Amino acid sequence: MLTTTLLTLTLASLSQLTIYTAEDAIRDKDGLNAATQYMDAICVNIRPECRSELAPIVAAIRYAENGGKGKEYGILHPKVKPTYRSQAGWCAATVQKNYDRWVKAGKKGDFISFLGAKYAPIGADNDPKGLNRHWVKNVKTYSKKFVW
């Protein structure tokens, strides 16, 4: 009886847990063409041995930023073209570069908090409403839902 109850509880819990591949999450949000561009950005900018950890973070950033056309990943650098692929590519490259910096610094703290300090710093001039204060929490929440 106890085993049946635990199994029922476990199955009930699993039915509430939705996990997507990062590619599926992007396809569901932005369409098939965007998912293809996302995958290209990942393959070009994130090393193969890092993809399982970093690709879901890139997808989580897309969901957390929720930017409109040409700013989907929240990249505001003047050299970024206002295209989905450019946004995804710059985001992926930024994630990889900051991951490398975090590792070199001794992996102090968690990576998403480290990344957030660079990607969406609290008090930034381009954040007059203070929304960056939610960035780390949002990216962590979404990244737990996505796998490579």
Regions found by a protein language model. Name each.
Residues 34-35, 67-71:
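Short amphipathic alpha-helical segments, especially helix-boundary/capping motifs
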Residues 50-69:
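Short, functionally critical alpha-helical segments immediately adjacent to catalytic or ligand/cofactor-binding
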Residues 71-77:
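Acidic/histidine-rich, surface-exposed loop or edge segments in extracytoplasmic proteins
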Residues 2-50, 78-148:
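Non-catalytic cell-wall polysaccharide-engagement segments
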